[in-house]
Amino acid sequence: LQAWLGWRSYRKVAADWRKIVIYSESGQDWHYIEALIEVLNHDLQQKVTYVTSDQNDPRLSRRHHLFGAICIPEGFFLTLHFNMQKADVVVLTMMDLDNLQLKKSINPVHYIYLFHALGSTHMVDHANSYDAYDSLFCVGPHHVEELRKRESMQAMQTRNLFEYGHPRLESLLSAARAYEQGLEHETSDAATPPV
């Protein structure tokens, strides 16, 4: 029932709330997407619709006038949601879009992959794990170099690659520096490990 209700709720979301959609497989993804949402909501004053498959994701109760959250648990309705999704931009930390059960929408959507792993794109993941994305927010130049090489080798269309960094790691490093300077009480919640 929860999946159907979530799917139905998303279908009722107004178009201006579907300009930027962020999909999270679990609440643990928040470590990687929080900084992006903060910039979108606070700095750029952009509405964000957050879709999670985690029924216990604390962001389902987050209150902000530019943030809305919907839960669509894994299963038939999540697959249907991905297949028929209407959105301008969808940001995910989930690799293998279009390779496994979750496919790109039949509607025009710009898909952005937000890396959560620091490692190589071809040493651990499937060779085509990132092929379905239109843009990728890369951790650093190594991702850009590897993805460009794959585009060249596979005669793929050139995608938008950005050296975005790794907000979770940067937050932890910032917290460590603050701790060393005796400022541990000034660290943000983003730097606090989950309990």
Segment roles from a protein language model:
Residues L1-W4, A132-V195:
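A nucleotide-sugar donor-handling region in carbohydrate enzymes
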Residues S9, A14-D29, S120-H122, A175-V195:
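Active-site donor-nucleotide binding/catalytic segment of nucleotide-sugar enzymes
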Residues T49, V91, I112-Y113, S135-F137, ...:
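Hydrophobic/aromatic beta-strand patches that form the interior of the parallel beta-sheet core
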Residues L1-Q85:
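N-terminal pre-catalytic "stem/leader" segment of glycosyltransferase-like enzymes
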Residues E34, P58-S129:
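Extended catalytic core of nucleotide-activated donor transferases of GT-like folds
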Residues D29-Y32, Q55-R62, N99-L100, V144-R148, ...:
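Short, charged/polar "capping" segments at the starts of alpha-helices
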Residues K19, Y23-Q28, V51-Q55, D88-V89, L92-M95, H110, F115, S135, ...:
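Structural motif
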